[in-house]
Amino acid sequence: MSEVKIGRKKEKCENCTKQCNKKQSDESINSLQEKGVASGEVRESTSVQQVLLSACLSCDGCISEDEGKRISQQNLDEINHVLALNKKCDTSKHKILVVSVCPQSVPFFAVKFQLDVSAAAQKLCGFLKSVGVHYVFDTTIAASFSILESQREFVQRYRRKHHDANAMPMFTSSCPGWIRYAERVLGSVVTPHICTARSPQQIMGSLVKNFFARQQKLTPEQVFHVVVAPCFDKKLEAVRDEFYNSILESRDVDCVLTSGEILHLMEQSKVTVEEVDSAPLDHVIGEISDSGLTRHDGRGSEGFLEHIFKHAAKEIFGLDVQDIVYKTLRNRDFQEVALERDGETLLQFAAVYGFRNIQTLVHRMRKGKVPYQLIEVLSCPGGCLSGRGQAEGEGGRPDRTLVQQMEEHYSSLPVRLPETNPEVQRLYQDWLDGHDSPHAQQSLHTQYKDHTHLPAHITNPDIQW
């Protein structure tokens, strides 16, 4: 790809999408910032720098001016605008306001409210409904779909690995930062290996705008769908062209707000936690008997690696794995797990989190063979609970005390396997017409593409999987 000039101030290069809501009028070009540079040149003449897109390894990569405009609209002003329209007499402009909360965001509110996770979720729900939100959902159900589809895809890839060079390894991630980097920097070296299952956020978007809207006798454009997430980069994912219906002029997710932005909304409202009435979260298909908050097995980022590992061990090798033992390599954010039988390694997976560890992974890819069948990649060290939309402390670094408290709250939730969730199985039939239907493929999967012409040192033909 040709050189892309990016107006970039040195002190702003850590959080590109965080700066999207702040107009940088003093910079030479009105576009957004990157988080960091892995290699290549950074020419620094004044406070404004020019960065080669192909040299940038960041949470979001380079963002175009058009994307920047769309992301900048995802803020509290947009929500307040919808709420204001709903109060006016012209009902033709009214929208049903739906908020979907990521499970990694709820522990943040538990810490801030000084409540347990379930009580904090009900307080959050009560506050949102008090300002005019109609429905509040938990996105754990969408994560269940994403995990199940990822499990199924891994087994399919593994079984065709001998005649499909792109089958292994499979990269799994719900991290838009990693996806951006893979598409814009690594390109065709990696994109065919990325699991096609949509992230929980975008499956939730499809579920709300498709199934839920139809159940409520609404069209998708009559629903304004907000996602509360721990990460600013989720705003970037929401504006991807793949998740926009040009005929209906409707996005699956209209707006992403971080946990910190929702807390700021509460502060703007000048309401205390004690003053907020608790309210139970809603369910996409109505009330069910066991309606408490749950989490998925594994670490605090939905545990894709663990679920796929256990499923593959059973489905491919007939082995029941109860507990997974991680082997730490460089640090706790670069770990391996292996399945062995009679001294033979049957499966070898890796979890790679954080900027530096992704650099290490890419370096190993360039040098030679990567031994893993599956790699879970996340841009934030520590995973999604450490997202900068909720865990950022002084100096732009994660607040370790806050992250530790959130991890403890998240771990306190009971674990439910996606396979045992009756709501998920019911939706496979009522919404998707079965597990392997064209509707399921369309609603639960997407494709990732090579969006750049890569320089020779990245598209190294010697890279072997």
From Swiss-Prot:
Keywords: Nucleus. It is found in: Nucleus. InterPro entries: Cytosolic_Fe-S_CAF, Fe_hydrogenase, Fe_hydrogenase_lsu_C, Fe_hydrogenase_ssu. One of its GO terms (cellular component) is lamin filament. Signal peptide: none annotated. GO terms for molecular function: lamin binding. SUPFAM superfamilies: Fe-only hydrogenase. Its main location: nucleus. This is Nuclear prelamin A recognition factor. Gene3D superfamilies: 3.40.50.1780, Fe-only Hydrogenase (Larger Subunit), Chain L, domain 3. The keyword Manganese does not apply. The gene is narf. It comes from the Eukaryota. Belongs to the NARF family. It comes from Danio rerio (Zebrafish). Pfam families: Fe_hyd_lg_C, Fe_hyd_SSU.
